[in-house]
């Protein structure tokens, strides 16, 4: 935390925009917001969509939800009123921003339709920012919140706010590849600041963007607070190997690969059970797959778990499995390592920045259930290896993925942008 002599200036106010806030699978955004607030930054949270009430699980979630401005579902009077105010008080700016939105996307009419939706969402956020005196919008993820944040700032600039309105975004994992290279390069050029959570992500943005914009692309790891480094897991020396997977149940997370690996382990007589924590569109297909593989008695689908309880699940496990097909540096992997668990993870994108194979965990080729099963079997046959990996992984997270370190980097970067605005 910043000392009294290092207080942020009164201009250190900004909007934080995410698709959902709070979000069960993106609890790291909540941690980041609270860490920045503790460092004298005034953060106002905005979300494109309301959070599913079933995913508001803790008191912190409820507080975050109640204080967040949400666009959808729209409050009709406020939604229409924002557009009428923007159109009637600045028709040229409104139409120029709409034209900008419709002229830039790839994907033909389908892409333009999405940009129209983003424009419709951006105007109420601009109006709320105007009411609150906010002129900088930071988006988590390049799309869709990145598109909307860009349009919010664009509308502010078109209305005469050049030099005052600006925007920035954080790029994480697969979101880097959801935009076309030209679209993402344009976002990097338009933004005042770009935060990447991994060196891999930064390298990909540098590959797409012109060199004159590289300086604004910085790395600030997501991180964990000190509570995560207390009372770690104690892997057992015998009995069924208790495997844990945590995350959204979506195709890119690779849970189907993990189920195939469990089937292979069962065929080889390796005693292992799996708990899957999380929710998503693949829940029912994964349950059907488990039944078809004959491993339903070895797999438990727990559903969503709040941050106030998730640590109990890490502490009850012996090995953490992350079979993703693409990731930045997953926070669930940090949580597992901070809990002292040995991890088996896919060797893809930013993951090797956290997992050094054979040192802080085991890396396997993504999409290959045989490789995943072999790594798990190795840990089942050598529990002492798991304990060594768990200790080393825990040290890695403590030393390099501490929330305070990342928050200080973000604070410094935001203050540079905001002080530049104030000087104009």
Question: Language-model segments: which ranges?
Answer:
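Conserved acidic donor-binding segment of nucleotide-sugar-dependent glycosyltransferases
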Residues: 357-358, 362-369, 378-383
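Aromatic "clamp/platform" in nucleotide-sugar-dependent glycosyltransferases that forms part
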Residues: 325
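Carbohydrate-associated surface elements
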Residues: 200, 223
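Short hydrophobic beta-strand element within catalytic cores of glycosyltransferases
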Residues: 342-345
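Nucleotide-activated donor-binding/catalytic signature segment of Leloir-type glycosyltransferases, i.e.
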Residues: 287-305
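A short, well-ordered alpha-helix in the C-terminal region of glycosyltransferases
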Residues: 298, 371, 378, 385-400, ...
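Conserved donor-binding/catalytic core segment of Leloir-type glycosyltransferases
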Residues: 235-253, 259-262, 275
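Short alpha-helical donor nucleotide-sugar binding micro-motif in glycosyltransferases
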Residues: 188, 304-305, 312-317
């Amino acid at each position: 935390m910043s000392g009294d002599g290092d207080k942020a200036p009164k201009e250190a106010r900004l909007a934080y925009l995410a698709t959902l806030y709070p979000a069960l699978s993106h609890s790291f955004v909540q941690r980041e917001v609270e860490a920045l607030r503790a460092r004298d930054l005034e953060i106002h949270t905005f979300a494109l969509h309301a959070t599913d009430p079933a995913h508001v699980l803790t008191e912190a979630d409820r507080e975050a939800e109640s204080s967040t401005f949400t666009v959808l579902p729209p409050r009709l009077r406020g939604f229409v009123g924002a557009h009428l105010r923007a159109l009637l008080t600045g028709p040229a700016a409104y139409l120029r921003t709409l034209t900008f939105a419709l002229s830039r996307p790839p994907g033909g009419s389908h892409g333009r339709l999405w940009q129209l939706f983003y424009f419709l969402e951006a105007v109420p956020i601009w109006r709320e920012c105007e009411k609150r005196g906010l002129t900088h919008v930071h988006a988590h993820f390049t799309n869709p919140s990145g598109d909307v944040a860009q349009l919010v700032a664009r509308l502010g600039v078109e209305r005469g706010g050049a030099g005052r309105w600006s925007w920035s975004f954080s790029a994480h994992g697969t979101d880097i590849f959801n935009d076309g290279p030209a679209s993402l390069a344009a976002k990097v050029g338009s933004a005042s600041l770009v935060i990447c959570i991994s060196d891999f992500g930064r390298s990909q943005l540098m590959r797409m963007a012109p060199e004159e914009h590289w300086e604004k692309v910085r790395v600030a790891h997501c991180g964990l607070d000190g509570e995560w480094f207390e009372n770690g897991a104690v892997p057992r020396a015998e009995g069924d190997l208790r495997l844990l997977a945590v995350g959204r149940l979506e195709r890119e997370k690779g849970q189907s690969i993990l189920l195939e690996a469990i089937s292979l382990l069962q065929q080889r007589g390796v005693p292992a059970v799996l708990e899957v924590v999380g929710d998503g569109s693949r829940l029912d297909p994964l349950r059907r797959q488990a039944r078809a593989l004959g491993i339903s008695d070895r797999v438990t689908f727990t559903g969503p778990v709040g941050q106030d309880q998730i640590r109990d699940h890490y502490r009850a496990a012996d090995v953490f499995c992350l079979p993703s097909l693409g990731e930045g540096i997953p926070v669930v992997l940090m949580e597992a390592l901070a809990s002292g668990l040995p991890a088996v993870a896919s060797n893809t994108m930013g993951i090797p920045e956290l997992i050094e194979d054979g040192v802080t965990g085991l890396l396997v080729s993504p999409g290959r259930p045989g490789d995943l099963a072999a790594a798990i079997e190795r840990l089942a046959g050598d529990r002492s290896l798991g304990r060594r990996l768990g200790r080393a992984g825990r040290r890695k997270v403590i030393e390099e993925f501490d929330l305070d370190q990342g928050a200080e980097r973000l604070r410094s970067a935001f203050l540079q942008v905001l002080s530049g605005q104030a000087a104009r």
